[in-house]
Amino acid sequence: MKSSHAYLVCILLLSLFSLHQCVRLERSNKIDMSVCVHEICGGVFDGGCYCCPKTPALCWADIQFCTTYCQSQT
């Protein structure tokens, strides 16, 4: 009976350690969604354009204007 208790405690500790590692990994992998994404756009924007990730239909040729607009949307 004691060996089964030790086995369950061991499984619990391994599970808690795995969960702790996942939380640490998740915190370090946060993506900053306020930064504009460089896209290839045709027509007016020959060198490409910058779009907000949340609204990909709105794109601008100037990265500074896009960054200002994307930050105001959050």
From Swiss-Prot:
The keyword Membrane does not apply. Keywords: Disulfide bond, Signal. Disulfide bonds join C36-C51, C41-C70, C49-C66, C52-C59. It comes from the Eukaryota. expressed in flowers. InterPro entries: ESF1_brassicaceae (IPR041608). One of its GO terms (biological process) is suspensor development. Residues 1-22 form the signal peptide. Belongs to the MEG family. This is EMBRYO SURROUNDING FACTOR 1-like protein 4. It comes from Arabidopsis thaliana.
